[in-house]
Amino acid sequence: MANIRLGIDVDRTQIVATYPYTANVLGDGGYLVVADENEQIVGFLWAFKRKIPAPIEQEELFINVIEVFPEELRCQGLATRMLERLKEIAAAEKVYQLRAYCDIRNVSSHRLWVKTGYGNNPVALPDGNIVGSFVSLVL
């Protein structure tokens, strides 16, 4: 069973080296949560704290990326466990909510958000086409 833990700089370096596209989504600071099995990272999420504008005027953790790989490990609870760990961090940080954006084509991700209790706010283009959703969990 995978270990879920806070990531460190060496984890970030390993993730970027293995999956170069992540260099664009893993920012400095923030919160890196990793799932590792036998000292191999098999999943991660990265979130950052930001201020929500009026009328809420509180802080949230925005989940910029969540990944589980290899593909055969998906839909087995790793992402759920990483989100649970982030929720613990968010509670300790006393943030208002956890939030993320999910592309409409990412059906398995939408299922994850619904399963873990996140509310769904569709995003529509001016022509009415829905392109994705902001999902959030108020703490």
Task: Tell what function each PLM region has.
Residues 33, 116, 122-139:
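C-terminal "cap" of GNAT-fold acetyltransferases
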Residues 69-72, 105:
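Active-site acidic-Proline motif in GNAT/NAT acetyltransferases
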Residues 80, 104-122:
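Conserved active-site alpha-helix within GNAT-family acetyltransferase domains
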Residues 90-102:
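Conserved GNAT acetyl-CoA-binding A-motif
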